[in-house]
C-alpha cells in the first residue's frame, strides 16, 4: 500500500502538530500516548485507503505510461479485502471518537477528500485546482487540524489563533506537496493526457505560483506557529536546518526547491517538518516533563529514515570540518615566522 511513500512524509509532521499543541497547552505529551496511537493508526488507515484507490483508478493510465503501479499482480480479492478492511477499521475509529463531532468530521473529511480526488465520476485529480485542494486537504489540512482538535479535546481548551495558523500552514504545505508531485509525474501524465493542474499551466507559471504565493503564505503562517508555540529550541533547530542545507549545497551541490523538481534536489523545509520540528517539541517538553523524553526514542523508532540520513550527513560534515581544521593548522605551522 505504498507505505514507504507516505508513512514518514505525512504522519511525522502531523504528530509534530499534536506535540506542539500539547506543548502550547502546557500538558505532558506522554499523557496523550493512547490518543496519539489511535490518531496515528487512524491516519495510517486513511492513507492506506488513499493509496489503494489511487492505484486502482490510475491502473490503466499507469500501464499506458509505463509508470509503476503497486496493484500489478494483486488479485481482485486482495484489492477488495484491502478496501473493505480499511473502511471497516476507519468506521471503528469514527465510532470511537463519536463523542466529539469536530474530531469525527475532520477525520471523515480526509476520507471524502481522497475519494473525490480519485474515484469517478468525481475524479477531481483531472479537474485542475479542485484536485489540488482535495489532495492538499486530505493529506495535510484535515490531519493537522485533527491533531489540534484531538489535543484540544483532551485539554478542554481551544486556541483559535493556533487553529487558524495551523490550518493556513498545512493547506499551503499540502498545495506545495501536491504541486511537486504532479510536476514529478508530468512526463507520465502527458502520455495519457491526464488533465492535472500541473498539465494545465506552464512550468514557469507554476514556479512563480509556488515561490511567490504558496510558500510565502506557508512560511508566514509557520512563523506564527513558532511564535505561538513558544519553543526557542524549534527556532534554534530551524537555524541548524538552514546551516545543514547550506553545507549540503556547498559539499554536494544539492538544490533546494519549492515546487519544481531539479536534478539532485531537496524539497525546502520538508526535512525540518519531518525531523527537526517534532524533535524540538519533544525535547522542549522534556525540559518541563522529564517523562516526555521517552517519546523521543519512540518517535525515532517509528520514523527512522530522515534521522538516519541526517546522521550520516552530519558525520560527513564533521569529518570535512576536521580535515579543514587540520589543513588550517598545517598552514599555520608551516608559515614563515615574522622577523
Q: For each predicted feature, which ranges?
A:
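Multi-pass alpha-helical membrane architecture of UbiA-family
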Residues: 1-339
